[in-house]
Curated annotation (Swiss-Prot):
Xref: InterPro entries: Redoxin, Thioredoxin-like_sf, Thioredoxin_domain, TPX, Tpx_CS, Tpx_Peroxidase_subfamily
Catalytic residues, chain numbering: 60
Gene3D superfamilies hit by this protein: Glutaredoxin
EC class (word): oxidoreductase
Miscellaneous comment: The active site is a conserved redox-active cysteine residue, the peroxidatic cysteine (C(P)), which makes the nucleophilic attack on the peroxide substrate. The peroxide oxidizes the C(P)-SH to cysteine sulfenic acid (C(P)-SOH), which then reacts with another cysteine residue, the resolving cysteine (C(R)), to form a disulfide bridge. The disulfide is subsequently reduced by an appropriate electron donor to complete the catalytic cycle. In this atypical 2-Cys peroxiredoxin, C(R) is present in the same subunit to form an intramolecular disulfide.
Bridged cysteine pairs (disulfide): 60-94
Keyword Acyltransferase: no
UniProt-recorded name of the protein: Thiol peroxidase
Biological source species: Halalkalibacterium halodurans (strain ATCC BAA-125 / DSM 18197 / FERM 7344 / JCM 9153 / C-125) (Bacillus halodurans)
Domain of life: Bacteria
The reaction(s) this protein catalyses: a hydroperoxide + [thioredoxin]-dithiol = an alcohol + [thioredoxin]-disulfide + H2O
Assembly and interaction partners: Homodimer.
Amino acid sequence: MASITFKGNPMTLLGNEVKVGDKAPNFTVLANDLSPVTLDDSKGKVRLISVVPSIDTGVCDAQTRKFNEEAANLDGVEVLTVSVDLPFAQKRWCATAGLEQAKTLSDHRDLSFGKAYGVAIEELRLLARAVFVINANDEVTYVEYVSEATNHPDYEKAIEAAKAAL
C-alpha cells in the first residue's frame, strides 16, 4: 500500500494500490455536465490520469495546466484530471483557466475512482496526488503516488510514459 502525508501528517489511503502491469480498474465519475464517465468510455486510447486533491489549490492548478499543455502536443493521449471537487467547480475552473477542452472529472459522489486506484484519503475525503498512465489495452504502464500531497508529481516521467505507451 502506498503511503502519503498531507502537510507532513501521515494519511490513510482507502482501496488497493495500483501497480505497473495491472489491468486498469474501471470506475465511474462525473463529467462537468453531470453525465457518468467510466474508463471504458476512452477504451482504445492512451490515458494519462492526473489525480489532484482539489483543483482550486496552487499545486493542483499547476498540475492540471501542465499536463493539459503537454498533452496538446501528444496525439492519441487523453488527459483526465480527477478530483473530488464538484463538477460545477471544475467547470468554473476550466473556464477561468481558459482550458475549456480539459477533461476534469469529479469523484465526489462515492469515491469510485479513489477506492479503485488506492488514492482516497480517509481522513480528508480528498484524493491523494497521483499520476497513472494506461495504454490502449487498459494496462497500467506508469504509476506515481506522490508521497507528500502538497508536492508536484514528476511531470517529465509521466509525459515520457505517456509517449512510450502510444
